[in-house]
Regions:
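Beta-sandwich interaction modules
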Residues: 116-134, 214-246
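Extracellular-facing segments of soluble proteins and assemblies that are Gly/Ser/Thr-biased and enriched
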Residues: 111-192
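Secretory targeting signatures
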Residues: 1-24
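Short, low-complexity, disordered segments immediately C-terminal to signal peptides
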Residues: 24-43
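Sequence contexts marking disulfide-bonded cysteines in secreted/extracellular proteins
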Residues: 20-22, 85-92, 261, 290-292
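Long, compositionally biased interface segments
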Residues: 223-315
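Short helix-loop boundary/capping segments
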Residues: 162-232
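Solvent-exposed N-terminal domain segments of exported/luminal and surface proteins
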Residues: 54-107
Length: 316
């Protein structure tokens, strides 16, 4: 795998986590679908089966810096210690470490009982280097993952994809491992992609005349490893009238953890495998001059949306 991708490349790419900006946090199969339906009772929250691995003795990268980042020289993907909703009283220490874009994690300490998302350590790939990455041009967009997060009662958060469209103006999240939180926003419907059942919710933002979400696709049953057909998610949103494949563009795909609380004690979070397979749309180059601006924009977007996100927390 080459570190740099030619700007003109529009082809099939299978990648082990990438990113578009060096050393900075950024703004952040085959489907069978069901017509939007009435609200279903949430499924029971399952526990992650394996305890997360802690940091190795000598990782290639480690930092406790606010929004510190590292680019994997083999893949060009960026890993970020994204602490977008810090500093505030509930924020504690968070250390990010990495050996590769497919082997990294954080040790996070967030206040007991806090219910607002404070941090989102994640790995990212950006799209549309020289031209907009139209959703209609994508013929495949699939990701695989293996992650582990704490399951203790005081842990509040989830492992999730955070996908940005339309130059950071539209947000789609896919929750795969949810610990001790649930939604009470209106349910848009349910869907099955690749044998996985999702409940689908939406906050009511609007950008450029279109709903900007965030949209939330929440697995009915937690998975700590699996395959996610991201393109099928976009296709469901288009059929429901929320996206247009002819107009909407893909900006970035992130994967990591939204962390609200670790019960005030250090907890390990670990990703041991991740791939993103892309066909038909253009990846961004490794480095872009607008990284810092987009990091700030992402923080502003999250500050506007996340602290007011309507959750009821369970599992105390």
């Amino acid at each position: 795998m080459k570190k740099y991708l030619p700007a003109a490349l529009i082809a099939t790419v299978t990648i082990l986590l990438s990113a578009a900006c060096t050393g900075a946090a950024q703004p952040s199969a085959h489907s069978q679908t069901h017509t939007p339906a009435a609200i279903n009772a949430p499924a029971a929250i399952a526990a992650s089966p394996a305890a997360p691995a802690g940091p190795p003795a000598h990782p290639k990268f480690e930092s406790t810096g606010l929004n510190a980042g590292w680019t994997d020289p083999e893949t060009g993907f960026n890993i970020s210690n994204d602490m977008w909703n810090c500093p505030q009283a509930a924020c504690g220490r968070q250390e990010v470490w990495a050996n590769s874009s497919g082997d990294w994690g954080v040790v996070s300490t967030m206040a007991k009982g806090n219910t607002a998302v404070l941090v989102y350590p994640a790995v990212q790939q950006q799209f549309g280097a020289n031209q907009p990455a139209l959703l209609g041009n994508a013929s495949e967009l699939v990701s695989t993952f293996t992650e582990a997060m704490p399951t203790t009662a005081g842990t509040i958060g989830e492992a999730a994809y955070d996908i940005w469209l339309n130059d950071w103006n539209t947000e789609v999240m896919i929750w795969v491992d949810n610990q001790h939180q649930t939604f009470y926003q209106p349910l848009l419907g349910t869907a099955t992609f690749g044998g996985q059942q999702f409940r689908i919710y939406m906050d009511h933002g609007v950008s450029h005349g279109y709903p900007s979400g965030p949209f939330f696709f929440v697995l009915q049953h937690n998975e700590t490893h699996g395959t996610i057909d991201i393109l099928a998610v976009f296709q469901w949103l288009e059929r429901a009238g929320y996206l247009s494949a002819a107009k909407d563009t893909l900006t970035a795909v992130d994967f990591g953890w939204e962390i609200c609380s670790t019960n005030g004690v250090p907890e390990n979070f670990h990703i041991s495998h991740y791939t993103l397979t892309v066909q038909g749309i253009q990846l961004s180059a490794v480095s872009q001059p607008s990284c810092n601006d987009r990091r700030i924009q992402r923080g502003q977007s999250r500050r506007n949306r996340r602290p007011t996100r309507a959750f009821t927390r369970i599992g105390y």
